[in-house]
Amino acid sequence: MFVHPQFDPVAVSLGPLSIRWYGLMYLIGFAAAWLLGRYRASRPGSGWTPLQVDDLVTYMVLGVVVGGRLGYMLFYDLPAFLANPLSLVQVWQGGMSFHGGFLGVLAVVWFFGRKTGKGFWGVADFTAPLAPFGLFAGRIGNFINGELWGKATDLPWGVVFPDPRAGGVPRHPSQLYEALLEGAALFLIVWLYSSKKRQSGAVSGVFCVCYGLFRFAVELVRLPDPQLGYLAFGWLTMGQLLSLPVIVFGLWLLARRAPDQNASQ
């Protein structure tokens, strides 16, 4: 059993400016994605320039932040949004949704593909290996904040979180499970898969299937958002429900892009 260290929510203070851990983790995730994107662009035959990566990551930041916040309010806290629409811009109060951010990124991919002539899948497959860095950093931010914990457990790595709502009992550190699976493991899988030429959309398909399965599995030991609870069967969460179409979409991509077709990465 471990006791959560109860970090100061403010990571850095520069006079009147305070940077919270969650925001810092997002910054680290985007910076890592940018560096990896530039590395991929530098490889011979990539078809990408460093400037294009700079532009893409800039648009991605907007897509993730706007989509993630809007998705959270619509999927997880709709009554609060309807009661106070201005809560949408109160990002400092927390509340970001991967699935909303995913939709925001899809919009960016479509726009950037048209803008550069690379096409939707050309941009999507290039972007897929970059995304796990942000997912990893975001989940570490959740753990530092002591939020989104799991169910009670007697496993030796259970963590006692400081929030009184956690009941003072050891719980699954579901944030770390997600960081390892949706971040580290997903990066390794997608990176290795993308190291060889694949059919258009295949890399994106692997990303969607693996992310959806990892998220669905961890949600089994993670407590649902208190304002929603379980949606059905005493275990189905909103995160699982939203992950199902992501998995189906990924499977469709892999089935649609047959291995014997011409590679177009």
UniProtKB/Swiss-Prot annotation:
Protein name (record): Phosphatidylglycerol--prolipoprotein diacylglyceryl transferase
Organism whose genome encodes this protein: Solidesulfovibrio magneticus (strain ATCC 700980 / DSM 13731 / RS-1)
Enzyme class, spelled out: transferase
Entry EC number(s): 2.5.1.145
Family assignment from sequence similarity: Belongs to the Lgt family.
Annotated Gene Ontology cellular component terms: plasma membrane
HAMAP family in the record: Lgt
Keyword Magnesium: no
GO annotation terms (biological process): lipoprotein biosynthetic process
Membrane association type: Multi-pass membrane protein
InterPro entries: Lgt (IPR001640)
Residues reported to bind a 1,2-diacyl-sn-glycero-3-phospho-(1'-sn-glycerol): 139
Localization terms from the record: Cell inner membrane
Gene assigned in the entry: lgt
